[in-house]
Regions:
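Short polar catalytic/cofactor-binding loops
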Residues: 77-81, 566, 570-573
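Secretory targeting and sorting signals
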Residues: 2-36
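N-terminal hydrophobic targeting/anchoring segments and the immediately downstream early-domain regions
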Residues: 37-362, 367-374, 393-401, 408, ...
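Aromatic, loop-rich ligand-recognition surfaces of beta-strand-rich domains
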Residues: 573-575, 580, 584-689
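Residues that line or immediately flank small-molecule/substrate-binding pockets and catalytic motifs
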Residues: 173, 287, 390, 412, ...
């Protein structure tokens, strides 16, 4: 506004009028105070103007239910700050900006004037990528359920999800150095840990940005939490508990080149300590590309082909497959053509072909990967098993089960669902990817009996700004559309169509275009899948925080067998410089082992020195393992009792659980070898429970 001076005389307006005019200007151009009609604690004291509408009325629920349990939905997998990763130009727009909504919700520079250079958009969406790049205030073409390159996590849209009943959000800090390096547009370097640090800081900045609207530090609804008790307190206040996670392909610099690790145990410890200081409490060890920690679950189709090419460019190796040994399997490997990706291969290098009956990644959890898993357990962090190959996930489960560690999460449907009961039995948490209401409800009902058995809730993983795609519209003429306005699950709020600028979204015709439509999607699930599915989701916050809390309280058991006296039916002897004696199975060194002669009827006996209550025994097999064996205990070395047996061991790390019994002596009695060699055990652990 420009005020010009005139030479003719005019009566000056009264001071009160000037003050009123200035106040009006301040209201138009400055922050917007809370509505006088709805002045509750949940409304900001001063929201920036202009800004997005929330379109929810009513007070967010607080407290607990009659049994002291928190309530609310949990999004176990979102990417609030992915616009800061991948070189800074893959995801266009920001979740907040001090300069306001117009600055936050604008497209990448190269998308102007018509999207011709929106290369990643047409790679992922198809077509030519052309679109109207203008965001605020018109939003003609984005955000959209099928546009993977535009901001969906604007803070006000997240606020709407919170107002609709969500109480926990896991913000996975994400990037990918390979994608960054090959993408045409970037405004920064591609180091993954640099991006993770920046995204963590931006999340804290977003918390401060929201706090400022509510009058100062600690007063906003967006609360970053670093322990489960803090999270429970936030949820009981009716606010949103935000947990930091990490999903990246080369954590701590742990890539592999030509199968040679590029990191050390010291790098892993330093990396875990740094992430913990940043507030990270949940993480993936591998994502998309095989690294020095673990092999991945493959992507399918053209995207899988492109990622396989990316793996070669980064590591010098393509994915390798083998026949699966159990009912679990990795995704069928991508074989569809991806010309733009394949053109980047060096001359003379072509994608390998893969046998149709070989659907498992040959790479599992490496020695460094096992070290990282145990490092996370030591720090009471939660392990995300999605994206791990079947072989890697299986070994990770073995380790978690051997320690009774509950901190395991499957957050967005990238785990073989045959592992579901293993997760629940440990005390872990499962969330399903944000798919269409029909598919999501069907999957929820498929696993409903297991949730009832273990008395747990359910979650969803929106994976917004995670380049995945989201539920499309069911259509305005569907027989049971979402009817606006509708009531929130708790009944305390009324939710209408969401408006930002001049654009109003309707889930029936737009699908899940952005995060603000999460409450609408949940209402769609209620209509399609029934109230029971929504009730399980509403118990999600309690179950997630229970998993987290039990992880924090976990204490490693004392290995009663460590350093004990051991004897055996035999010990292999073929090299005078290698010791395979019985004591090697209880020496605390995972690199040593006891090995028997090459026949079935062999045993290993451990003397604990005194009688103890025993309820759990772990066997860490070398490649020569026992397919069938039994575990016996005795108090006098004469009268033996069988406490556990199997005829179908698959090797690796076996955990035998049984009702606690007094025992001084423990014996592993082999019945049938799985290989032509004898029985070979790296370590035997004996625990009270």
């Amino acid at each position: 506004m420009t005020i010009s001076r005139h030479t003719h005389h005019r009566r000056r307006p009264p001071l009160a009028v000037l003050s009123l005019l200035l106040a009006v200007v301040a209201m138009v151009l400055g922050p917007v105070p809370a509505s006088a009609a709805d002045p509750g604690w949940w409304n900001p004291v001063a929201r920036p103007a202009p800004d997005s509408d929330i379109n929810v009325t009513g007070e967010p629920f607080k407290g607990t239910d009659s049994q002291g349990r928190v309530r609310g939905f949990v999004d176990a997998h979102d990417h609030l700050m992915s616009n800061e990763g991948f070189g800074g130009r893959l995801i266009c727009g920001k979740p907040f900006s001090e300069a306001g909504v117009a600055d936050a919700l604008k497209d990448c520079p190269e998308h102007y004037p018509d999207g011709t250079l929106a290369i990643f958009d047409f790679i992922t969406k198809g077509g030519d990528g052309k679109h109207d790049p203008n965001g605020w205030p018109t939003f003609k073409d984005w955000p959209a359920h099928d546009s993977l390159t535009h901001q969906q996590n604007y803070y006000a849209w997240v606020e709407r999800a919170w107002r609709g009943g969500q109480r926990v959000l896991v913000n996975d800090l994400v990037t990918n150095g390979v994608i960054c390096s090959v993408y045409f547009f970037k405004d920064r370097g591609c180091d993954e840990m640099t991006a993770i640090r920046l995204e963590a800081q931006k999340t804290y900045d977003m918390q401060a940005y929201i706090d400022k609207m509510y009058g100062g530090p600690g007063k906003g609804w967006f609360r970053i939490v670093t322990d489960s008790a803090q999270a429970r307190d936030v949820v009981q206040q009716g606010k949103l508990a935000v947990v930091l996670g990490v999903e990246t392909s080369e954590p701590f610099g742990c890539k592999q080149i030509l199968d040679i690790s590029q990191c050390s145990k010291q790098d892993i410890d330093r990396g875990l300590d740094e992430l913990y200081r940043l507030g990270v409490r949940s993480m993936f060890l591998c994502h998309k590309f095989d690294n020095a920690l673990c092999g991945v679950r493959f992507d399918e189709g053209a995207l899988g082909t492109a990622i396989n090419v990316g793996q070669f460019l980064s590591t010098g190796t393509f994915w390798k497959t083998e026949k699966c040994t159990g009912p679990q399997h990795d995704n069928p490997i991508g074989l569809a053509a991806a010309p733009s990706a394949q053109s980047k291969l060096p001359a003379g290098v072509a994608l390998p072909s893969y046998a149709g009956d070989a659907q498992c990644n040959t790479r599992g959890l490496t020695e460094l990967g096992e070290y990282a898993v145990r490092g996370m357990m030591k720090r009471k962090m939660m392990l995300e098993v999605d994206h791990m190959s079947v072989k890697a996930a299986g070994r990770a489960f073995d380790i978690l089960e051997s320690e009774s560690y509950p901190g395991v999460i499957s957050s967005h449907s990238w785990m073989d669902m045959d592992w579901t009961e293993r997760v629940y039995k440990l005390g872990g948490f499962i969330a399903s990817y944000m798919s269409g209401a029909e598919g999501f409800s069907a999957e929820a009902k498929r696993t409903d009996a297991l949730r009832d058995k273990y008395n747990v809730g359910y979650g969803y993983g929106t994976d917004m700004n995670g380049v995945g795609g989201w539920p499309g519209p069911r259509g305005a003429d569907t027989p049971n559309p979402v009817r606006y306005p509708f009531r929130s699950t708790d009944g305390g709020s009324v939710i209408d169509k969401q408006t930002t600028g001049s654009r109003t979204w309707d889930l029936n015709t737009d699908g899940a275009a952005h995060y603000g439509l999460v409450p609408d999607w949940i209402e769609d699930i209620r209509l399609v899948g029934g109230q029971g599915v929504v009730d399980d989701l509403f118990k999600g916050a309690e179950s997630y925080l229970t998993t987290w809390g039990n992880s924090e309280k976990h204490k490693s058991g004392v290995n009663l067998a460590a350093g004990s006296s051991a004897s055996a039916s035999s010990a292999e002897w073929w090299n005078p410089f290698v010791n395979f004696s019985p004591g090697r199975a209880v020496d605390g060194d995972s690199g040593s082992r006891w090995a028997s002669e090459w026949n079935d009827n062999q045993w290993l006996r451990i003397d604990l020195g005194s009688a103890n209550r025993v309820g759990r025994i772990t066997l860490d097999w070398e490649a020569a393992y026992g397919k069938a064996y039994r575990i016996e205990v005795s108090t006098d070395d004469t009268n033996w009792q069988t406490v556990w047996s199997t005829t179908a061991s698959d090797g690796g790390l076996d955990t035998a659980r049984f009702s606690g019994v007094p025992a001084r002596y423990v014996r592993v009695q082999g019945l049938q070898r799985a290989t032509q060699w004898g029985y070979s055990l790296h370590e035997v652990g004996v625990y009270s429970g």
